[in-house]
Amino acid sequence: LFRSSDYMLAALASAVLPNLGVAGVRENVQASATDEAKGIDQTVIQDASGKLYDVYATDTREGRTRLIRRVKAAQTLAAARELGGLGFDMDRVVAFVPGDVSQPGQTATAQAVRQQAQAESTPLTPRKPGPTGETTVMIAVHRDGQARPLDLLTLDDCAAVGTAIGAIHRLPSTFLANAKYPVVTTGQIRSQLTVWIRRLRSAGHVPQEITDSWARIMDTEGLWSFSTCTVHGGFSDGDFLFSGSTITTVTNWQDMQVNDPARDLAWIFGKLDESHRNAVLSAYGRMMGSDRK
């Protein structure tokens, strides 16, 4: 059953790409709870030649920010040569329209300065309205697969997830540094945690025996023997798309960076029971232990 919003999204896609020739809409089986919570609608459209495209649209500030960052990440990944042979697809953006709104994330002061500069410019050039009004729209090549809640993954799904995360963590990180994404070292993580514990002690909001326990853990031998690496940034429902138990696509790379590999594994302790966690970690360990090529 198609929703009225599916046809609205198809109309927006036609406004963004008038030559696309939208012929219809398809059932969307890749809905993301995270996108929905931020006010992002999604549908699948088909053009006259049978090609499929994913269309995302939002009128909310949080949704705009998420889509803008997602597009930037997709463009960075598309330009990176290091990503060959991952074994799964990623977002491939065809078109993007940010909408006729102030830039998401821009402070009120920055907006005021921009508006003042525009007001003082002579002659005043009227701003040409965009094709989608205030609606932010992203169109991407449709990716095969179905979204699956992380807490409903099978053991085979979990093994595929562990392998995929390992493949991500083995990626050279140069492309992230070149694109100005965050690059954090192990030493910086330790320093940040040390400062955080010190501040908690000073504030007195946390019992001293707890902060003392954390400080002792910080000094545990071997705790800081890991190396930071390329990370996705943390997974939510809908970030993995599956065909059977094979991962076809990993999406939503907007938080990618060089950081603690645990960032990509933390979710398993809140979403999976022990046997499913072990399936993820075993596959991940095999991937990370294999010889680098």
Each PLM stretch: what is its role?
Residues 5-20, 115, 120, 173-232:
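An alpha-helical support segment within catalytic cores of ATP-dependent transferases
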Residues 6, 10, 59-134, 150-163, ...:
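A conserved alpha-helical element in kinase catalytic cores
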Residues 17-32:
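Conserved N-terminal boundary motif of the eukaryotic protein kinase catalytic domain
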Residues 35-47, 217-263:
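Active-site acidic catalytic loop and adjacent metal/ATP-binding pocket
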Residues 39-72:
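ATP-binding glycine-rich loop module of kinase domains
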Residues 99, 108, 112-121, 132-152, ...:
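A glycine-centered beta->alpha junction motif in the catalytic cores
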Residues 243-291:
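Active-site Asp-x-Gly
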